[in-house]
Amino acid sequence: QRQMCIRDREKAREEEPWPLAKNTLDLLWSNLSAAKEKDLPICQDTGMACVFVELGTDVHIDGSFEAAIHEGVRRGYTDGYLRKSIVADPLRRGNTGDNTPAAITVHLVDGEGCRITVAPKGFGSENMSRIQMLKPADGVEGFKRFVVDTVKQAGSNPCPPIVLGIGVGGSFDKVAYLAKKALLRPLDVPNPDPYYAALEQELLSAINELGIGPQGFGGKTTCLGLAIE
């Protein structure tokens, strides 16, 4: 994803008419290059470790699988000197000191393999998440209005240019999972359904017409890509 962000950033700079937006993209590019060279995060907010597991039904694991994942997160954040943001209780606010627990989602699949994807999710973007229970009569137009309005309300808070994950359908908890899962899809891979692939492009254009721009300084580069699941 990082390489695709680099490529899309270069394309965005070429197409960006606003000088301040171009300059901001250059600064973001310099930061990304420095992070790659020094093996450091591009932002101090290294967020929560969201772990997606595809676990084969023929896999047998001795011991606690979740405990092993938490230990991996603990070591990664400690050895990598990443900021510890996670609290043991959301209201009493005591920091766990090692960024655990992780948010773990397990999806059972056929076979005897196990695939683990770790996606650190910064809270600057996480806090901009929204959910809406649309009425059937709202239709696709209501869906599009909600998506564009969500980005408009968020403004500069998620540090644009953003990558947007959108979940649609299912229950309250399922749609949030779909939105997270959508962020794992490579930026250059459209939805396999032509209807949703076209909708992704339509929404991308509408969002970039909002004029929020890089870091909220204006311009047409508000969103590098989005995925609907």
What are these regions (language model features)?
Residues R2-I6:
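Short, small-residue-biased leader/transition segments that mark boundaries at the very start
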Residues G47-D110:
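A generic, well-ordered mixed alpha/beta core segment in the N-terminal half of proteins
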Residues R7-L55:
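N-terminal low-complexity or amphipathic/hydrophobic leaders
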Residues K174-L210:
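Catalytic or ion-translocation cores adjacent to nucleophile or general acid/base/metal-coordination motifs
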Residues R7-R9, L20-L25, D39, D79-R93, ...:
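Flexible, glycine/charged-enriched surface loops at secondary-structure junctions
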Residues L108-D110, R115-T117, G219-E229:
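C-terminal edge-of-domain segments
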Residues K38-T57, P158-V175:
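Conserved phosphate/anionic-ligand binding catalytic regions in large, soluble enzymes, centered on
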Residues G113-V189:
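Conserved mixed alpha/beta catalytic, RNA-binding, or beta-rich assembly cores of soluble enzyme
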